[in-house]
Structure formats: structure tokens, C-alpha cells
């Protein structure tokens, strides 16, 4: 199973943890966006949107990290704990995945990426929105072990990849005790977490040092 990725990318790390959780070995294909490797004709045939992560499973190409996570959990999961079949439980997992994509990860990008890639000054309004996003997650976690209940799901793996990026960027989790406790549980219990940490550290070394 080919996996086109960059280790520093939080979405790529979320897929790597999901693959570890379902026991699937990925054939890693480093894809350097800075060198334009995602624009090569052979890659565009696989993914005309030319983004990573991209997974190719026996000729079936799929991109968008959360779609890949769902695919891996449904096809290769040994049970439904990672992605529950119960409609309401699954709906909560989906909501958390969409929250990560549209709010938590996006607000990190909105605040940090203009500084990293365009050398713009920090935007206090975007910083507040980023903190608000972590506050939402802190509320979601009230009274439960994980993001969608008391079992670790693919939502936690996606969120943990994002929060690991917040961590290496120096975000202070002290005002968000539920997030801090949950993140410690993810570090201890998420399959493949070492890959996530290594990738987050690489992101820091490349873009935040």
C-alpha cells in the first residue's frame, strides 16, 4: 500500500497512526512539495488535486487524510472501536473529524502559516480564534476520556496530530486541563504515536526554529 506523504504534515501523521492502529504497513513515498514532486505527471494521474497525503491501495487512490482514516478503519479495522458502526457514536466521531479539519487545524494554519511562509507579523485576532478552538476541544472532552467518548477513535488520532503541532509551536495548554489530560492519554495509548512525535519535531525543526 503506497503512501505519499511528508512526515511534518499533521494530516499525514494522522493517517500513519491510523494505519498502525489497524495493523497496515505503509510503503512510504516521501513527496517534497517544495520541490514540486506533487506536480509530476505520474502523481497527477493518481491525484489530480495534487495534495498529500495520498494513499494507493491495490490501484485505488484516495486523498484527504480523514477520508483515508475512515477507509482504513472500515476496511482493515479488526472491530469497530476506531470508527463505531452505531449511527450516533459514528456521528460524533465524524463531527470531531470535521471540527479538526475546519476549525482546530485550520485556525492553527490561519495564525502560523502567514508568519512561516509569508513572513507576516502575528495576527492577534487569529491567535484568539486559535485559542478559542482549543477551548472548544476542552469542552468536548469534559467528563470523558477521549474526543468522542471513552474509547480512542480515529477522531483522536486526527486531533492528536494537530495538537502535537500546536505543542511544538509552543502553545500553552495550562488553561485547557481537559486537553492536556487527553493529549497525555493519546501519547501513552495511540498506536504509532512515536511517528507523530517525530513528524511534529521535524515540522518544528524545518519551520519553527
From Swiss-Prot:
Q: How does it assemble?
A: Homodimer.
Give the catalytic activity. RX + glutathione = an S-substituted glutathione + a halide anion + H(+); 1,1,1-trichloro-2,2-bis(4-chlorophenyl)ethane = 1,1-dichloro-2,2-bis(4-chlorophenyl)ethylene + chloride + H(+)
GO process terms (BP):
glutathione metabolic process
Annotated control of activity: Inhibited by S-hexylglutathione.
InterPro entries under this entry?
Answer: Glutathione-S-Trfase_C-like, Glutathione-S-Trfase_C_sf, Glutathione_S-Trfase, Glutathione_S-Trfase_N, GST_C, Thioredoxin-like_sf
Gene, per the UniProt record = GstD1
State the source organism's domain of life. Answer: Eukaryota
- Record-given protein name: Glutathione S-transferase 1, isoform D
Is the Iron keyword given for this protein?
A: no
Task of the protein? Conjugation of reduced glutathione to a wide number of exogenous and endogenous hydrophobic electrophiles. Has DDT dehydrochlorinase activity.
Give the family from UniProt: Belongs to the GST superfamily. Theta family.
Lyase as a keyword of this entry, yes or no, is yes
Question: Which positions form S-S bridges?
Answer: none
Q: What is its EC number?
A: 2.5.1.18, 4.5.1.1
The entry's keywords: Lyase, Transferase
Looking at the record, the residues that make up the GST N-terminal domain are 1-80
Amino acid at each position: 500500500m503506497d503512501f505519499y506523504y511528508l512526515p511534518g504534515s499533521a494530516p499525514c501523521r494522522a493517517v500513519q497512526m491510523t494505519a498502525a492502529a489497524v495493523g497496515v504497513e505503509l510503503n512510504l513515498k516521501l513527496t517534497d512539495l517544495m520541490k514540486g514532486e506533487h506536480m509530476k505527471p505520474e502523481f497527477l494521474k493518481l491525484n489530480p488535486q495534487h495534495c498529500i497525503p495520498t494513499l494507493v491501495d491495490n490501484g485505488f487512490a484516495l486523498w484527504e487524510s480523514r477520508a483515508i482514516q475512515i477507509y482504513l478503519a472500515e476496511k482493515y479495522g479488526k472491530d469497530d472501536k476506531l470508527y463505531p458502526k452505531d449511527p450516533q457514536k459514528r456521528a460524533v466521531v465524524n463531527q470531531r473529524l470535521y471540527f479538526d479539519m475546519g476549525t482546530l487545524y485550520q485556525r492553527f494554519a490561519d495564525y502560523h502559516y502567514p508568519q512561516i511562509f509569508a513572513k507576516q507579523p502575528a495576527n492577534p485576532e487569529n491567535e484568539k480564534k486559535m485559542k478559542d478552538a482549543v477551548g472548544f476541544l476542552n469542552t468536548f472532552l469534559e467528563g470523558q476520556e477521549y474526543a468522542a467518548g471513552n474509547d480512542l477513535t480515529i477522531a483522536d488520532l486526527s486531533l492528536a496530530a494537530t495538537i502535537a503541532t500546536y505543542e511544538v509551536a509552543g502553545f500553552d495548554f495550562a488553561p485547557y486541563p481537559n486537553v492536556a489530560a487527553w493529549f497525555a492519554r493519546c501519547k501513552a495509548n495511540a498506536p504509532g504515536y512515536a511517528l507523530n512525535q517525530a513528524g511534529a519535531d521535524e515540522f518544528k525543526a524545518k519551520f519553527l526554529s
